[in-house]
Amino acid sequence: MERYENLFAQLKDRKEGAFVPFVTLGDPSVEQSLNIIDTLIEAGADALELGIPFSDPLADGPTIQEATLRAFAAGVTPTQCFEMLALIRQKHPTIPIGLLMYANLVFSKGIDEFYAQCEKVGVDSVLVADVPVEESAPFRQAALRYNVAPIFICPPNADDDLLRQIASYGRGYTYLLSRAGVTGAENRAALPLHHLVEKLQEYNAAPPLQGFGISSPEQVTGAIEAGAAGAISGSAIVKLIEKNVANPGQMLTELKAFVTAMKAATRA
């Protein structure tokens, strides 16, 4: 959790927002996935949001479902994902690493064992996408036991009660949803969410990062202008992986250019 605090403090000093890319671990293969993650970091990613392939990803649009299928086709297992996480942490000791998960993957290991393993490999946060705040107690309690930040999604229609709960239970950062629905770059992010950001700040929530449909530098700038601490981009990045599956070198070149442009927008 300290890695997030350190990151946001450093960014504040530099008057920058955070740019956080999302990819699925093991897409399109373990080896190329590790190359991709190195490239994202070299190009300026401030933190990582990583998915573990899961057979029924509810909140994911078609782009990220395809990423999951590619990882499955490469034979990637949750155990391998944790081995990858340990390697990433070894190589990049300071970058915050977050997991975006589904509850079944946590249950299959046992909640306590899952978070213990997260701590062991150096994961900083876990967002369990299909567990609402009111059912989150066993997850967030285990997370805090192992010094892992529980992340909560703040939807655009959140009422005051939900905002207070998110502020109270969340650590690390708050995942600010640009709009309701499934992920995807083709569903452009809606208007910036000034009122939510103000309320979250009033209740001392962890810094908000805006996600869902973030695919251009202008949207990153817009998120930061609305008061968000930064932006998360998933589908736009995964699309570049999909487009260049047959050409790994070109894939890394395009990913580097995209992340460089998105990170530059946090300094505007």
UniProtKB/Swiss-Prot annotation:
Which InterPro entries does the record match to this protein? Aldolase_TIM (IPR013785), RibuloseP-bd_barrel (IPR011060), Trp_synthase_alpha_AS (IPR018204), Trp_synthase_suA (IPR002028)
Q: Which Gene3D superfamilies match?
A: Aldolase class I
The pathway noted for it is: Amino-acid biosynthesis; L-tryptophan biosynthesis; L-tryptophan from chorismate: step 5/5
Its subunit composition reads: Tetramer of two alpha and two beta chains.
In terms of Pfam families, this protein maps to:
Trp_syntA
> Which reaction is the catalytic activity of this chain?
(1S,2R)-1-C-(indol-3-yl)glycerol 3-phosphate + L-serine = D-glyceraldehyde 3-phosphate + L-tryptophan + H2O
What keywords are assigned to this protein? Amino-acid biosynthesis, Aromatic amino acid biosynthesis, Lyase, Tryptophan biosynthesis
Q: Which GO terms describe its molecular function?
A: tryptophan synthase activity
Looking up NCBIfam families in the UniProt record yields: trpA
Q: Which organism is it from?
A: Citrobacter koseri (strain ATCC BAA-895 / CDC 4225-83 / SGSC4696)
Per the record, the domain of life is Bacteria
Enzyme Commission (EC) number:
4.2.1.20
Name the record gives this protein: Tryptophan synthase alpha chain
Active-site annotation = E49, D60
Enzyme class at the top of the EC tree: lyase
Q: Which GO terms describe its cellular component?
A: cytosol
